[in-house]
């Protein structure tokens, strides 16, 4: 096992991986780029973001380059994961302010000294805002089936409880998968890291990349509950 994944597990960060053996081989062979997406629904980060930040720092520690994806576009829709009702739709001004604040915070806590591991900051609004709906359905939508989308926890839970799920929210998982595809094409990003509640969305991304370009990409998730971790374990990277 490579040193990155070993420490990832030793620290208790590990929950699931789409193809652990192949990811380990890739990391042993070359330096990679991995990304984590951050929601921009609030002016600042919450305590749950701490583990994700440490994952980015761990990538840097072993010579890999992290990509911070700011969800300026997807925040305009709202992630239904873990929610039993539709999120409040924020104004454009609120989202832009939140995005700038979160980027400022993350630039302070990540290592910017080494140009090889310096974080790359992207905002998915830059590519989502100009999507052509017909082209998107033809090129991307054809790779998703309603049958499978209905099995994901974020959707299934709402429907089982007979709670409404808007068409807007239903599209969130497709857009997140598309984010991974865009980063794979533009930055050669081969890894997405996220909380275990994002597993379905992350798997969608790896599968979309495989179908669209026949390239291999990987997903790695962390526990949503951090009760098994101590603060020094999380923060000492």
Regions found by a protein language model. Name each.
Residues 8, 46, 121:
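Divalent metal-coordination and catalytic microenvironments
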Residues 1-40, 216:
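Non-catalytic terminal extensions that flank enzyme cores
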């Amino acid at each position: 096992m490579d040193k990155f994944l070993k420490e990832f597990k030793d620290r208790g960060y590990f929950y699931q991986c789409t193809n652990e053996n192949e990811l380990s081989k890739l990391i042993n062979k070359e330096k990679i780029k991995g990304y984590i997406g951050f929601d921009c629904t609030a002016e600042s980060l919450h305590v749950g973001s701490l583990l994700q930040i440490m994952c980015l720092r761990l990538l840097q520690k072993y010579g890999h380059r992290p990509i911070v994806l700011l969800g300026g576009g997807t925040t305009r829709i709202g992630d239904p994961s873990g929610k039993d009702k539709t999120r409040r739709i924020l104004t454009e001004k609120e989202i832009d302010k939140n995005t700038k604040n979160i980027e400022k915070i993350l630039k302070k806590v990540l290592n910017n000294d080494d140009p090889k591991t310096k974080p790359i900051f992207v905002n998915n609004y830059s590519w989502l805002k100009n999507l052509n709906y017909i082209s998107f359905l033809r090129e991307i939508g054809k790779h998703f089936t309603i049958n499978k989308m209905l099995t994901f926890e974020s959707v299934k839970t709402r429907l089982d409880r007979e709670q409404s799920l808007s068409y807007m929210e239903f599209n969130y998982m497709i857009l997140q998968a598309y984010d991974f595809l865009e980063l794979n094409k533009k930055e050669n990003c081969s890894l997405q890291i996220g909380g275990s509640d994002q597993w379905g969305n992350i798997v969608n991304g790896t599968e979309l990349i495989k179908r669209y370009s026949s390239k291999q990409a990987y997903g790695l998730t962390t526990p949503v509950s951090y009760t098994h971790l101590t603060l020094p374990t999380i923060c000492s990277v």
